[in-house]
Amino acid sequence: MDFNELKNTDKDIYGIIEEEWERQKNGIELIASENFTSKSVMEAMGSFLTNKYAEGYPGKRYYGGCYIVDKAEDLARDRMKKLFNAEHVNVQPHSGSQANMAVYMSVLKPGDTVLGMSLNHGGHLTHGSKVSFSGKLYNFVSYGLNSDTEIIDYDEMRELALKHKPKMIVSGASAYPRKIDFKKIREICDEVGAYMMVDMAHIAGIIAAGRHESPVPYADFVTTTTHKTLRGPRGGAIICKEKYGAALDKTIFPGIQGGPLMHIIAAKAVCFGEALKDEYKEYIDQIIKNAKVFGEELVKYGFRLVSGGTDNHLLLVDLTNKNITGKDLEELLDKVNITVNKNAIPFDKLKPNVTSGIRVGTPAVTTRGFKEEEMKKVAYFINKAVENREGDLSAIKREVIELCEAFPLYE
């Protein structure tokens, strides 16, 4: 990227950007919710479109001069509809959390009962956590995983639904490595007369590529982010049945947002366009292959995987038998240029800011070009760091940097 102007006008921010670039360039990025966008996506985000205010929707704006940016939003909507075979979409949400809020506020009233996946078992803050708006505005009841299989307990979900008669059942997760049975959830929703909402933020790209069953035919509402596996700009989007479209659009604007971010919407259009290409399916296939091999290698080194493995892009690693917390391993790996995040495991006895596990994912390293052999090396680096946690880590760090140099970013 050309930062010549910024370098001259704001050396402080330029310096911070350069520092972050060095970190990304020389580090192995394993945070499951992160990815590296294409240069095309970044160019759209940094374009003249950032200058345009466009409250409202294409053809129905509250500002003049929107006839060009209307084309960008129409293109983003059309591409998203094609990608997910959707009836109605809205590409204006600023984030995944905003998308979830919009769905809730379009069909629920404060105090309504909602069923959502427990944050401690892999759900998301906006699926009913007491510290989130969702848990404060609505009466969320949590379902979780079966303690033996560490798979979603659909029997418990049904029992809770029959008992509490929720207005909505929310599925989708932020730390769940297995496939989700959307058909079964639809059946439970129908049995109790509940709306079905799916937050597919983490697996949207996998669904777009046809490597996970799509929730779109089953759900009333589907929300997503556009980064993560979709590899687009940071933002949100919503799919719904046509009959809910008008109410949903009105909830987003003027309900919870003002002007949309037209430069981000254009970048969303770019990422949807990229995801419609055949090579994107190959990319998603490699993400899944990399995750499986990565998991198998970690198991060889004695790490335990929650549920025993993965069907998607992420792994939840139980560190209990390694006598190290998620917090400590996150900090340890930072020292060797490997980035992970501490994460609670199901039925975790440690605090959320300590945790007994880490969450790792393969979208970013796959974008970088890593394949199965590189993932074996990454597992080796992690195990070596754990074994030498009290010793000199400089040799591991050098090996990590050498691997990154063999797979340069944005070149």
From Swiss-Prot:
Q: Which parts pass through the membrane?
A: none
- Root EC class: transferase
> What EC number(s) is this enzyme filed under?
2.1.2.1
Q: Which Pfam families match?
A: SHMT (PF00464)
**Where are residues bearing N6-(pyridoxal phosphate)lysine located in the sequence?**
K228
Reactions catalysed, semicolon-separated, are: (6R)-5,10-methylene-5,6,7,8-tetrahydrofolate + glycine + H2O = (6S)-5,6,7,8-tetrahydrofolate + L-serine
Primary localization class, coarse: cytoplasm
Q: Which GO terms describe its molecular function?
A: glycine hydroxymethyltransferase activity; pyridoxal phosphate binding
Q: In which pathway does it act?
A: One-carbon metabolism; tetrahydrofolate interconversion; Amino-acid biosynthesis; glycine biosynthesis; glycine from L-serine: step 1/1
Cofactors needed by this protein, per the record, are: pyridoxal 5'-phosphate
Looking at the UniProt record, the site noted as Plays an important role in substrate specificity sits at: H227
Annotated Gene3D superfamilies: Aspartate Aminotransferase, domain 1, Type I PLP-dependent aspartate aminotransferase-like (Major domain)
> Where found in the cell?
Cytoplasm
- Give the UniProt keywords, A-Z: Amino-acid biosynthesis, Cytoplasm, One-carbon metabolism, Pyridoxal phosphate, Transferase
What SUPFAM superfamilies does the database record attribute to this sequence?
PLP-dependent transferases
Q: Which GO terms describe its cellular component?
A: cytosol
Q: Which PANTHER family match?
A: SERINE HYDROXYMETHYLTRANSFERASE, SERINE HYDROXYMETHYLTRANSFERASE 1
According to the record's subunit comment, the protein's assembly and interactions are: Homodimer.
Family assignment?
Belongs to the SHMT family.
Q: What is this protein called?
A: Serine hydroxymethyltransferase
| Gene from which this protein is expressed | glyA
